[in-house]
């Protein structure tokens, strides 16, 4: 199916039928260059495999009606599908994946939804180079394992309890080389174990990483933290996670002083990241809404002076950004000195002659 516009489908929720602009239950179908709007679900792939969805645009009715409409693209009990180069906005969830394994979702743009991408009971999926902007939550991985999230962007996901990525009740997932910026929380982990968080950039978020005590045995390595209000918060009792792998920790920006006398870009001693904001978040969820307040910086500073902050992270092998080699300033004068010397010698010879 190619080059079609589909609109004005039923939005009735009282029927057992989940209405959608397109619903497929066959094998090896292709949906290319489609525009879908004013329907319940945009595209519903149900119990069918090997489907290609490419360059499909789905538009819902807006954030004010998220609860009364369906998802942009929905995959249920299906596998080996590709969703790529598509744009979804103003639906309930952008892409919803349930009991669906071995799918590839790449190069899509999702905005103004509840969750941009929502995995439930889905394993062995690949999630690559997607962009999630201005959603309540960028992506949600729930009750799933062995998912690879690589080179995605999560930005401006703001609101009450918002996040770029949530990993909940999930295990053995890899979050690699993604960017999290200007989110309320970059990554939020709850009741999850043995996930690998590597090479990601967290900058200008309210909270870079939020870890609840029910999340343990995560591995964090080669991540960059820069100018977040709180780089890491651990909520509840102490959780046991690993902040380095094979002698490679994380980059902590300018907040933590790291000494590197041997110039190998690895700190000579462990560093601790401390914060007192966990107290506010534990006591009252409304605290998330005030993290940008100037009073928060004062609160942190007071607790730092009083030594009442709690250790959030101990990084045994903190990393240091490699400085760009610059030309020594003295070298800039060598050409000028050579020219001046040549002029001086020439004038001296002319006088002698």
PLM regions: where:
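Extracellular beta-strand-rich solenoid/capping regions of secreted or surface-exposed proteins
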Residues: 1-2, 7-29, 41-48, 75
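Right-handed parallel beta-helix
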Residues: 2-8, 28-38, 49-62, 79-92, ...
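Extracellular beta-strand/beta-solenoid scaffold signature
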Residues: 14-23, 38-41, 65-76, 90-96, ...
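Exposed loop/turn and edge beta-strand positions of beta-sandwich/beta-sheet ligand-binding modules
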Residues: 16-18, 25, 47, 69, ...
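Well-ordered, non-transmembrane segments within structured domains
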Residues: 25, 31-34, 43-61, 105-113, ...
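Functionally critical loop-and-helix segments that line ligand-binding/catalytic clefts
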Residues: 160-163, 204, 208-212, 217-353
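Eukaryotic non-globular interaction segments with acidic/serine-rich, low-complexity composition
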Residues: 187-190, 198-211
